[in-house]
């Protein structure tokens, strides 16, 4: 996003980068990944924690769609909001592009369903956008050979009335196994990586 903004500012064009298939729709995907509990759909290597995405302000400006800022508005007004040092470096994006919006007028998205039909298909469905209310379902398909998918051909989460009732077991840090001498990257039939599945 920052490269595209810099190219547009300096050269008047991003050279077609923002027109790459799926790039502009990735903002809506990120928005839908947060459930009504405030937790993220944590498939593959993803954690369930959510955070602010300052790039959403650029997307909202570029697409002329302030509803993309709905989750940002909630996140930035929470009392327990904090940023890591890595996240803090992107906060100026909020100042630059956020000045184009009146956050009091940001409304939730109208749509309640998002689907992605790629190699790893994803469907995200909700009954509303207010935290702690309604239902949220995230479903992921795919293949066991997809990168970072943990041999998982599918996953889902289900939330109702502010409670996550079902979810993927989540990721395990690679180091926790590697420090025990497990050779995770050996995909042979008799490789040690498969032993980790037996000891769950």
Language-model features and meaning:
Residues 2-166:
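Carbohydrate-active enzyme catalytic cores, enriched for enzymes
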Residues 198-200:
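Conserved small/polar residues in nucleotide/adenosyl-binding loops
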Residues 184-188:
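Canonical bilayer-spanning transmembrane alpha-helix
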Residues 174-183:
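A short, polar/charged loop-to-alpha-helix boundary motif
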Residues 190-192:
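Membrane-proximal cytosolic segments adjacent to transmembrane helices
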């Amino acid at each position: 996003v920052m490269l595209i903004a810099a190219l547009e500012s300096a050269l008047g064009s991003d050279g077609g980068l923002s027109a790459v298939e799926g790039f502009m729709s990735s903002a809506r995907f990120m928005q839908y990944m947060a459930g009504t509990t405030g937790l993220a759909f944590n498939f593959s290597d993803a954690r369930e924690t959510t955070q602010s995405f300052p790039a959403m302000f650029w997307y909202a400006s570029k697409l002329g769609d302030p509803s993309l800022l709905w989750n940002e508005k909630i996140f930035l007004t929470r009392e327990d909001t904090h940023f890591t040092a890595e996240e803090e470096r992107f906060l100026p994006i909020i100042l630059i592009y956020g000045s184009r919006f009146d956050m009091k007028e940001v409304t939730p998205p109208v749509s309640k369903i998002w689907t992605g039909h790629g190699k790893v298909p994803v469907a995200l469905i909700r009954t509303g956008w207010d935290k702690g209310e309604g239902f949220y379902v995230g479903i992921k398909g795919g293949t066991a050979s997809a990168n970072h998918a943990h041999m998982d051909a599918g996953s889902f989460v289900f939330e109702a009335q502010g409670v996550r009732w079902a979810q993927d077991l989540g990721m395990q840090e690679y180091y926790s196994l590697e420090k025990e001498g497990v050779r995770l990257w050996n995909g042979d039939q008799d490789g040690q990586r498969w032993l980790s599945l037996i000891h769950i």
